[in-house]
Amino acid sequence: AIILKDAPDEKDLPQMERCEGQDWIGLRIRHKGKITDLYINQLADGRLMHSNSWIMPDGWMTDAYMFAVSYPEGTEAKNAKDFFIAYGSALRRGNETYFSSLAKLFVIQKAEGKKLDLWIDGQPKINTTFRSTKKPMSVEVNDKKIPVVYQKSQIKVKL
């Protein structure tokens, strides 16, 4: 990978390692105490539009074209709260559903303290759920506050 430095003498650059599996390729990026795992689904490039585009990279299960998960170094990916999902309808790990929708969407999820920020695009009407181990005090979708609908570790978003 080519990384552009901000200054010629900059030494603190991200460390990257390639990974791959059946029908997916990926990158693990380590930088400043944070790990970001990025996966590209080689089956979900728009040629297949049905159940054959599911992949299982590193314990995750998704039909997204691309997804990323970020978590602090020294913790496990399954406890991550920050996600990027490109053109996907679900993200699961084991028996846990982290994201579920009847339509393929583009999603960014960022949890900070007791606040959950979501950016969702891809459909005019949204009906989806997101995993949260604790009920957040506030939820914002596309910079607009919405009522918190929380049940059984899932936040429901309907727009």
Feature-to-residue mapping (PLM):
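Charged, amphipathic alpha-helical scaffolding segments
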Residues: I2-L4
